[in-house]
Amino acid sequence: MLCEGAGVPIGVVVDGANRPDMRVVQPTLESIPVKRPAPTQRFPQGLCLDKGYDYDDVRDLVREFGYTAHIRARGEEAQAIKRHAGFKARRWVVERTHSWMNRFRRILIRWEKTPENFLALLHFVCALI
């Protein structure tokens, strides 16, 4: 799922849970249905990703789409916890969006057999959010 800064979903892709995150970056970026404004010096467009996306291929792909990648390196958070006793992990906006989506029981547990039906339900829920 791809969401904007306030947590509104703007792109959704359905894929298997056992698939590496880096494999769904391109389909997710291509799933944005509206044309976004071009990034400017004053308003650069960043893309915050977690450690599962910390690969050069992902960084190159994100750059091709015109985003600035903000990816926390593997092990960086663990080092910050060791250095600062009161350090708390940063909560990503997309995690909050996932919790909003979990209010809809129909998508919390996937009962649909085809990915097309499940994707349609996801689009419906994203429109409601």
Predicted regions and their residues:
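Charged alpha-helix within mobile-element recombinases
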Residues: N117-I129
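Active-site beta-loop-alpha junctions of metal-dependent nucleic acid enzymes
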Residues: V13-A38
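Helix-centered, glycine/charged polyanion-binding patches within enzymatic domains
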Residues: R36-P115
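Generic leucine side-chain signal with a strong bias for well-ordered alpha-helical environments
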Residues: L2, L29, L47, L119-L122
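Short phosphate-engaging motifs
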Residues: P9, D21, D54
